[in-house]
A protein has these predicted regions:
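Active-site metal-binding loops of divalent metal-dependent hydrolases
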Residues: 12, 135, 182
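Short, well-ordered beta-to-alpha junction loops that form the rim of enzyme active sites
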Residues: 47-48, 72, 127-136, 179
Length: 200
């Protein structure tokens, strides 16, 4: 059975209305240049405009690769821990979420894992899929790959167009090959949207 290689990336930098900025397009363009050497089979993207625009920019570098929307990749909170397990620093973040919203977020997160965090069904060669999504979805997939408790998605940050690669094999647990790699970006395009204090 073949292996699945998931190339997870957060959309390029977006403005306050969720539209890709010029910087975001440049970030996506540079990532496209990096990925044009990889045998990508498909590009999947969130339905939100910033992810769609990132996919369109990336697709110019991968002209023969199909591009499709995947609803599971939409930006959402994948899991809300019980109140006693929420770190003090995160408590305000979950204010206003009710049980229905929490259940819907968990349903989407479970569907994301069921659809993409598996070995390919076909016994053919390895598959290479790009998922253009959002920080929380990347954190959830990394948490799942590491078999960490559900609340450990909190605090796993992904920068715009940073690359995270997870490999799924039939006989071993998933392998996180790289996390939040920005080597394709010059220093001024890294960590966009993050406070200067955390930029290494």
């Amino acid at each position: 059975m073949g292996n699945r290689h998931l190339y997870l990336l957060r959309h390029g930098m977006a403005d306050a209305l969720g539209e890709l900025t010029d910087i975001g397009r440049r970030q996506a363009d540079l990532l496209g240049e990096r990925l044009d050497r990889v045998p990508i089979d498909a590009i999947w993207h969130s339905p939100l405009p910033r992810a769609v625009a990132t996919a369109q920019t990336l697709a110019r570098h991968l002209p023969n690769v199909p591009v499709a929307e995947a609803g599971e990749l939409i930006d959402h909170v994948p899991y809300i821990p019980p109140a006693a397990e929420i770190p003090v620093a995160w408590r305000g973040f979950f204010d206003g979420y009710d049980e229905t919203e929490a259940a819907e977020g968990r349903r989407l997160a479970d569907n994301l894992v069921a659809r993409f965090a598996t070995v390919p069904e076909s016994p053919r060669n390895d598959t290479h899929d790009v998922l253009i999504t959002h920080a929380y979805q990347i954190a959830w997939l990394v948490r799942h790959a590491l078999d960490a408790p559900p609340s450990r998605w909190l605090g796993l940050n992904s920068a715009n167009t940073a690359l995270t690669v997870i490999e799924y094999r039939a006989t071993v647990p998933p392998v996180v090959v790289m996390f939040n790699d920005m080597s394709h970006l010059p220093s001024d395009l890294r960590w966009t949207g993050f406070p200067d204090a955390i930029r290494p």
